């Protein structure tokens, strides 16, 4: 069977919204060099290649147009959505292996498609960014100290991929942000973190709006980012920002509106002793089109 190539929008059920990814299934007969060429040709921020695995249900390799990466949230949702549709799966739990290790993925079938949930890595936090570094980040976003939620740090958080959490007051016009990309790139080199995630909480709701800038790795702005919203959920628990029952915090993370690609990620944080223990991100997807590779590979 020739590789089938899919164009998928993840973290949305509406075409041309959310975050697009390429999916190639099956990809067992492709070499690493061929995978990289296909990812470059498709031009998505990430393309997922689904392969047979001896110790899990599926192995996935992820490629940007220029390099292989360990894992990608929206491409994972896209990949499992395609696999579920092709194989006609019902409600189930599967395990995937990747360069990031072994992860549990939950698949829920609905009348209009599937909802895919990915369990992320262990939450972690670096010391708050203070002094000149904090000021440089605020200045690079063309904000002021008065725009930041009082009493809360600007801080690197991770569930496998680190992002800088930047909590904004609700009245800040987040869609109007136009950061200094060169300044953010320079700061990335200083702090060893490539993603900046300003976000704000919708008043009275467990819902957020965010944007993710990562110019140091060639991504001016990512539409909807699982590896930003997941750490954000953990950060919100870590700093006791939103109310929860002591066991679970659920947050709807909205992103992509400023790019005309609005999407939504459901973030579920399992809590132990008032600290985040486990983070799961969930979302829908939609297949725009698929095609069989026409040339001999």
Swiss-Prot record:
Active site positions, chain numbering: 46
Cellular compartments per GO CC: cytoplasm
UniProtKB keywords: Isomerase
Record keyword Iron-sulfur present: no
GO molecular function: isomerase activity
Domain of life: Bacteria
GO terms of biological process kind: biosynthetic process
Protein EC: 5.1.-.-
Chain coiled-coil ranges: none
Protein family: Belongs to the PhzF family.
PANTHER family for the chain: BIOSYNTHESIS PROTEIN, PUTATIVE-RELATED, PHENAZINE BIOSYNTHESIS PROTEIN
Subunit details: Homodimer and homotetramer.
Name of the protein in its database record: Uncharacterized isomerase YddE
